[in-house]
UniProtKB/Swiss-Prot annotation:
Protein name in the entry: Flagellar brake protein YcgR
Subcellular location, record wording: Bacterial flagellum basal body
Effect of residue 121 to A: 1.7-fold decreased affinity for c-di-GMP
Species per Swiss-Prot/TrEMBL record: Pseudomonas putida (strain ATCC 47054 / DSM 6125 / CFBP 8728 / NCIMB 11950 / KT2440)
Domain spans labelled PilZ: 121-234
Keyword Magnesium attributed: no
Source taxonomy: Bacteria, Pseudomonadati, Pseudomonadota, Gammaproteobacteria, Pseudomonadales
Superkingdom: Bacteria
Amino acid sequence: MFNESDAPQPPKVLSTPLEIAANLRQLQESHDPLIITFHDRSHRFQSYVVHVDRESNTLALDEMIPRDGEKFIENGEHFRVEGFHDGVRIAWECDHALKISEVDGHRCYSGPLPQEVTYHQRRNAFRAALKLSQLVDIILDGAHLKGNGAMRGKLLDISATGCKLRFEGNVEDRLQLGQVYERFKAGNPLGLVDTMVELRHLHYEERINTTFAGVRFHNLSGQAQRKIESFVYQLQREARRFDKDDY
């Protein structure tokens, strides 16, 4: 639905255990990917919330991707966590040592719940989902793409600032979180050529043998920005007209 609540909101700082646990649990239940950045280090790592318990004041994060980020956890280095849930940015600082343990037989990092969480609703960047019958073909390529040849996939949804992509099979080992790929192309009717994108989210869904990637547009030209905004506006109009309740 489209109303004034979709307008941008200033960030809020959540400080009560109830609010913090509720928002972290949303990230857990939706399996929303997290971006982890260690202070004074350029690499980004991906994880997920796997356990939230307000009663015992504990939080557990899934094993990091790539795994080599674990050595920074072992060193007790501080880091920042950032996730997105339904257009809301949820972020916090981890400034204490975490314990490497297991939850349901899977490796994880556990510690206390954060004392503060930043909650920032960013609905102003309308994200338009494409119907399955209308998915746009995309090509992802660039100097830092691992493996042989460009990657071909589908555009699932798009906003003025980024888009979600789908690739057949497990392609996680070909991509690096935080990396910029300079040759992203999208077929008609969007028609983007050699656009720069930054990889923000990456998740392989084994059940359907599909990899999902979230990218943010990087240094867009004026022409590309206008193409994207026009395409989003077109999708927005169609969504209002045909599928109000679905968007």
